[in-house]
Every structure is written in structure tokens, then in C-alpha cells.
Amino acid sequence: AKAFARVEKAKRPVPASYGKDDQDWKRMLERKDLDIVFVVTPWELHAPMGVATMLAGKHVFIEVPIALTVEENWQLVDTAEKTQRHCMMLENTCYGREELLCLNLCRLGVLGELLHAEGAYIHELRSQMNNVEHGTGSWRTPHYAKRNGNLYPTHGIGPVAQYLGINRGDRFDYLSSVSSPARGRELYAKAKFPANHRWNTELTSWVGGDINTSIIKTVRGRSLMMQWDETSPRPYSRLNLIQGTKGTFASYPGRLVIEGETKSTHAWTEGATLETLFKKYEHPLWKKIGDLATANGGHGGMDFIMLWRVITCLRQG
């Protein structure tokens, strides 16, 4: 309803709707006038919808996480190769201003040899549990209760994997992953909902730890630390740290040290001084459309840039 209201407000033609039942989306794939499909649905539908879209001859762009199992990931890869259709995971955090700056710093060699990175998705989202019948919490909450690990890794690992050139000269080798006890969401359910509510009757044994920490080693010997926490009462952060032999950048808040360029290696460069370095090392993509992206919104402009890049790449073949 919200999407249709936006279309009407913009005075654009009302699009076709496919929502008669939970299989009606397959009817949409039968259309001959569709080139690309965006999959923005509950997690468990991402991979099946992606595979079906490519088999129908369309390119597919899938929200994170792109799949829930190793088998589903291989299904997407095999289908993309078989059908020669594009299959892209829509990781918007790779297109934020700070993330693009970091990528440029790394590619220009400003930070020296890259040694270590940190990423995370720390976002207190317990209130989503109030979406019981419809909405994000209605389908995400059971995942938290029944699965343990980092269920949403790519917001943190996506950008730093780009910095390190993962699968472009290096690759992940092995990892060690641990989770804390599962406490926060069970306590929230008991405090906010009656005893006979589905969150207190159907989800009686919560296994997903409140915070997960994973240490990854690459083939070239570099290290990464990844965290995920959508439960604990703490401020938002994606960490976004990249460390090299000549400097380090970290986010939340954005701060930078470059040996021989910033004032000291014992203190972060922040604020107005950092903005000067932003101007010097701004990524070409942000220089090109950063103002337009910011004006159009979407997580500070990153959504706009990601979608702009999708369409631009498709148009250029």
C-alpha cells in the first residue's frame, strides 16, 4: 500500500501487483517485458526466488543475506553460470561515503600494506519483535531463536572484503566463531508480551547468542574480526576499520591516521580536519554523484549509489 501511494503521489502509472497468494510472484516471472527482478523478501525466500528468476531468463538482484546455506549459495552460482544471468547481492554498505573513501585509500596505497580489518552490524532491533503477524519482526524473530552464529554478516564484512581484495588476490582461509549466551530477546519477550503470546510459547528455547564474534584468517595471512549484535542495548556501529603499515581508518565516528600526513599517530584525525582529507581522497563515484545520492536519501545516499551502479552497469553491458 505504501509503495502504491508513493507511485500515485509521483503521478506515475500504477504498476501491476502480484500478491494473490505466496506463489503469485511466479506469475510475474512469466512476463516477457521484464529484464531484471529485485528480491526484497523474507530471508528464506531469497535464494529460491533468485534461482527461479534466473531460470525465467531475468537478471536478479537480491537483498542480504543472499542465501541461508552453503547449498543455496551454490545453487545461485550454478544457476547464474548455466543461464548466463547476472546475480548480485545488494550490499548497500559498500557504497557509503566512508566505505568508498576507505576503498580509495586502500587502492591508492595510502594506508600501506593492509594487515587487519574489522567490521560489524551492531544495531539494537528488539522492537521489531512487535511485528508479530506482518513486517520484519514476524519472520526475523524465529531466526534469532532457532539459529546461532552471525546471521547477518555482510553489512560488516562486505566493505572490508573489498578493501582487502578478497577473491581479487586474496581469499578467506578459515575462521573461529563464538557467540555469547542468548538472553536479550527472551527477556524482551517476557517483559513486553503476555505469557500466552507466540514469542513466549512457540519460541521457548532461544539459541542465538546476543552477540557473535568471528575471527577470520586469509590465505595471505591477514586477519579480520567480525561482530553481529541486533539485541544488546548499545549504539549503532559497523566498526569499519582497516589497518595498514602506514595508517588506519575507523568509523563510528569516522577517524583516520596516516603516518607522515596526519598530525600524530597517537591521536585520531577527526571532524573538520578529516573532512579536508575526505576532499583529497574522495572516491570518484562519490565525487560524481554523491550530492545527488545524499539529496535522494536511502541510508545517507548509499542505497542510491548502489542502485545507480546496478543500472549503469546493465546499460553498459
Give residue spans per PLM region.
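Non-transmembrane alpha-helical segments in soluble domains
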Residues: A1-F4, K26-L29, V51-M54, V77, ...
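N-terminal glycine-/serine-/threonine-rich beta1-alpha1-beta2 phosphate-ribose binding loop
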Residues: A1-K58, W74, D78-H86
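ADP-ribose/adenylate-binding Rossmann-like module
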Residues: A56-T69
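Predominantly a Rossmann-like dinucleotide-binding segment in NAD(P)-dependent oxidoreductases
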Residues: T83-M88, T93-S205, L239, T248, ...
